[in-house]
Amino acid sequence: LFSHGSTIKTPDGSGIYYSDLIADYNEEIQTTKLSFIAQIDEYRFKSGTIGIRDIKIAEGPGKLIGIMGASGAGKTTLLNILAGLETPGKGKIKINGFDIHTEKRKVEGVIGYISQDDLLIEELTVYQNLYYNAKLCFANLNETEIELRVMKVLEDLGLDHRKDLKVGSVLDKRISGGQRKRLNIALELIRQPAILFVDEPTSGLSSRDSENVIDLLKELSLKGKLIFVVIHQPSSDIYKMFDKMLIM
């Protein structure tokens, strides 16, 4: 079986990705109304130093966009500004015409943010980590609805066959690095945000796991999500999965 976020390597070394099949055979018509516009004229650090300036971004649904640059170029800072975690001194970020800072309630639940940090509870299983997160997010849903939602996300991310394994610590390796990253993505994905901001999802992963994680994000974009990813030194195969690359 060709599972979600997986890769088949051909004899010549090139890859066939799950997202390729989604792109070829996905007949769903994307009707998502989504407009993301960022105008960042200037952002200063607390020291007063200018960190970001003259950035203009206008994107819609169904895109996987990378953010690349040298160490210290401000990639994560830009991601945080776009996600609304930092406020530009001059400029605005708007989703469907609503300012994400002054009209927060109008865009509530639209944004998802996945940091580099591992947020899993090592004593819990794969299923339990996502289940308890869902309980916190959906106090209005009954038990059956939560269980169905959790299993749907695990299946979509190819983690259903690992659901009863304890995740352990990052060094314990009870589940692979790629599976840990997918489960961290699931913690945000279960809320069904339309826009995802992901900070260095391939950090510390093998080349195969890195490809599988980006392939998963590509698959999500093909289903209508707008995804911004800070990426560091991607391979040529990973680079080609992005619809656009912002170089800093």
Residue ranges of model-derived segments:
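Conserved catalytic motifs of ABC-family nucleotide-binding domains
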Residues: Q192
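Conserved ABC ATPase "signature" region
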Residues: E145-K166
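ABC ATPase NBD Q-loop/coupling interface
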Residues: K92-K106
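ABC ATPase C-loop
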Residues: E188-L189
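Helix-to-loop junction immediately C-terminal to a conserved catalytic motif
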Residues: A83
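The feature captures the beta-strand-to-loop junction immediately N-terminal to the Walker
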Residues: M68-A70
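Catalytic Walker B motif of ABC-type/P-loop ATPase nucleotide-binding domains
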Residues: L196-E200
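Q-loop/switch helix immediately C-terminal to the Walker
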Residues: E122-A139, R149
